[in-house]
């Protein structure tokens, strides 16, 4: 199971970390994903869901 939101598709984003000298090194920003039990098509499953999807009510915990 990949670290991707099952509802919104949010996942880690990449970019650069900048030092004071403006040197660039690659880094990642992870999405705020929670592993929750939800009902999908009548079955209870454990999936990764973003905190934003949980707060907005797009999915409900079981």
Curated annotation (Swiss-Prot):
It comes from the Bacteria. One of its GO terms (molecular function) is structural constituent of ribosome. The keyword rRNA-binding does not apply. GO terms for cellular component: ribonucleoprotein complex; ribosome. Keywords: Ribonucleoprotein, Ribosomal protein. InterPro entries: Bacterial_rp_bL28, Ribosomal_bL28, Ribosomal_bL28/bL31-like_sf, Ribosomal_bL28_bact-type, Ribosomal_bL28_sf. GO terms for biological process: translation. It holds the Pfam family Ribosomal_L28. The keyword Repeat does not apply. Residues 1-28 are annotated as: Disordered. Belongs to the bacterial ribosomal protein bL28 family. This is Large ribosomal subunit protein bL28. It comes from Bacillus cereus (strain ATCC 14579 / DSM 31 / CCUG 7414 / JCM 2152 / NBRC 15305 / NCIMB 9373 / NCTC 2599 / NRRL B-3711). The lineage of its organism: Bacteria, Bacillati, Bacillota, Bacilli, Bacillales.
């Amino acid at each position: 199971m990949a670290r991707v939101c099952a509802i919104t598709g949010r996942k880690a984003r990449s970019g650069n970390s900048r030092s004071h000298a403006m040197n660039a090194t690659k880094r990642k920003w992870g999405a705020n994903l929670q592993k929750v039990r939800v009902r999908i098509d009548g079955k209870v499953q454990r999936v990764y869901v973003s905190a934003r999807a949980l707060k907005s009510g797009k999915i409900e915990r079981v």
